[in-house]
Regions:
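N-terminally biased helix-coil "hinge/interface" segments that flank
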Residues: 1-244
């Protein structure tokens, strides 16, 4: 098990045959957290006299995504919404926490996908999943080209009622990847296929915001683990307590 924390990274080694448990702590490496993870694995194996080649599973808990949100160091995110819903993140649910004083002191955080990087798709899906207005692909291409010129690093697609019919979102992603193959695209019908467009939008935008950094981190870590341990399987702790 591996859990990076600042300033230390904790490691726990379990021998499934003997039931023996060993632990170790090493300094974290903020510039590249994967280095600290690998150092910790090497340390706990050395202490336990276990060869790295004997490790079969690495279960990893990380706060890379959380830290990215808290420090505001995520990707430059573009957003595609249905025409008429461009300000979905700004309007939100018009909810202010607290009593009357909340209206005076509450400071709403800036959306992770700013309004100037939000475009509208001319399309409409009904609540029953029926196509009310066919997606205007030519207008979409023009809008996506303008987003590409803004040097976005990730793209979110959140169309009204897409949880009932994801056809238009999937088409938007297809066109976006054609125009911006290097930009990762997250669509709400896959991230959180649920009712309520604001909640769907903000969740999928958050996914896009942390995605490039988390993808790079996990890919680098997995690559290094496989190089050192060959048959090892990497599992990452999810927010619900499960492993993926």
């Amino acid at each position: 098990g591996a859990m990076p924390e600042n300033p230390l990274i904790k490691r726990l080694l379990l021998n499934e045959q003997s039931g023996e448990v060993s632990t170790a702590k090493v300094p974290s490496t903020p510039h590249d957290s994967s280095i600290g993870v690998l150092n910790g694995i090497a340390r706990v194996c050395e202490q336990s006299k276990v060869d790295l080649s004997e490790i079969t599973h690495v279960m990893h808990g990380t706060t890379v995504a959380t830290n990215t949100v808290l420090t505001g160091t995520g990707a430059r995110v573009g957003l595609v919404t249905t025409k008429g819903y461009r300000q979905v993140l700004q309007i939100a649910r018009s909810f202010v926490p607290g009593g009357l004083g909340g209206w005076v002191i509450y400071q709403k955080s800036e959306p992770m996908a700013p309004l100037e990087l939000t475009i509208e798709a001319h399309e409409r899906i009904s609540a029953k999943g029926e196509v009310v207005s066919v997606l205007d692909e030519s207008k979409l291409r023009e809008s996506l080209k303008s987003l590409a010129n803004e040097k976005i690093e990730a793209l979110t697609v959140c169309l009204i009622n897409s949880f009932t019919n994801s056809t238009h979102e999937e088409k938007v992603r297809e066109i976006a990847l054609e125009l911006m193959p290097e930009v990762p695209v997250s669509i709400s019908s896959e991230v959180i296929p649920e009712l309520q467009e604001y909640e769907r939008a903000v969740t999928t935008v958050t996914n896009s915001y942390v995605r490039p950094k988390v993808e790079t981190y996990i890919n680098n870590l997995e690559s290094e683990l496989l190089e050192r341990m060959k048959e090892v399987k990497l599992s990452v702790l999810r927010s619900d307590g499960g492993l993926a």
